[in-house]
């Protein structure tokens, strides 16, 4: 059904799809297969069949299955504007962090992302490379974008000097709360918007208690000095 829909869309555009359209079709096919069968269970032949292109075309765009997997994750991050150049930078600290955290929670609560977390966790023990790829291409890439924002706020004197990598992981964990765990376990299908907004607001406020410049007597002598994974 999915393949037929893609072929119909290509026919409506007339003639053979262009290179970018083929790359997009390959990404969509790979995403569907990775979610259904995992990285280890998905072959490039299957991706080619699902996308309605030749295997040679798949390899022409993505040199390996690992490269294709990374591209799928990267495309999801970019969909939510979660790359360094896509994050807002001209707001005050609270407004900026609220905007960043809203995007972060929209990303990690996206059904496809939740499903991919489950796939990776299920395969991590038997195929640890899959977990490494996901961690590097997803959480670490997202962390890098947020670290740049936190570094800018610190350079502007709006946050105390800190290790931005460590602080980014802290901010993510404050955002997760118990919402993401419930999603992963299938205890909830979606998060009510008001609950999501409340969680984001609390996370930002708690983060600013730790890091906002000009807060007296809050015991920050050691805050942010531990080194986080890069």
Please report, for each region that a protein language model flagged, where it lies by residue:
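Short, structured helix-loop boundary elements
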Residues: 23-24, 44, 66, 70, ...
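Amphipathic alpha-helical linker/stalk segments
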Residues: 70-101, 106-108, 112, 146, ...
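Hydrophobic/aromatic residues within well-ordered alpha-helical segments
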Residues: 22, 65, 72, 76, ...
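Basic, helix-initiating cap at the start of DNA-binding domains
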Residues: 1-37, 41-53, 60-61, 66-67
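Conserved hydrophobic residue
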Residues: 39-40, 130, 159
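Amphipathic alpha-helical packing segments from all-alpha helical-bundle domains
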Residues: 95, 106, 111, 115, ...
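C-terminal peripheral helix-coil segments that are non-catalytic and often amphipathic
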Residues: 1-11, 99, 103, 144, ...
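Membrane-interface starts of transmembrane alpha-helices
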Residues: 160, 164-168
């Amino acid at each position: 059904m999915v393949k037929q829909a893609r072929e119909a869309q290509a026919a409506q555009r007339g003639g053979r799809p262009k290179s970018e359209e083929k790359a997009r079709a390959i990404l969509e096919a790979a995403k569907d297969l990775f979610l259904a069968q995992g990285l280890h269970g998905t072959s490039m032949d299957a991706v080619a069949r699902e996308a309605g292109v030749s295997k040679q075309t798949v390899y022409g765009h993505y040199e390996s299955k690992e490269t294709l997997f990374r591209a799928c994750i990267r495309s999801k991050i970019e969909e939510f504007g979660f790359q360094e150049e896509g994050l807002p930078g001209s707001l005050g600290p609270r407004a900026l962090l609220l905007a960043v955290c809203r995007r972060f929670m929209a990303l990690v609560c996206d059904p496809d992302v939740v499903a991919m977390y489950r796939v990776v966790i299920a395969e991590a023990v038997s195929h640890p490379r899959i977990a490494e790829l996901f961690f590097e291409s997803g959480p670490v890439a997202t962390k890098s974008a947020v670290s740049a924002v936190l570094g800018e706020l610190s350079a502007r004197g709006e946050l105390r000097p800190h290790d931005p990598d460590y602080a980014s992981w802290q901010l993510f964990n404050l955002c997760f709360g118990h919402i993401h765990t419930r999603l992963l376990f299938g205890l909830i299908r979606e998060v009510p918007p008001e609950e999501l907004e409340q969680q984001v607001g609390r996370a930002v406020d708690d983060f600013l208690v730790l890091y906002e410049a000009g807060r007296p007597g809050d015991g920050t002598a050691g805050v942010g000095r531990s080194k986080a994974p890069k």
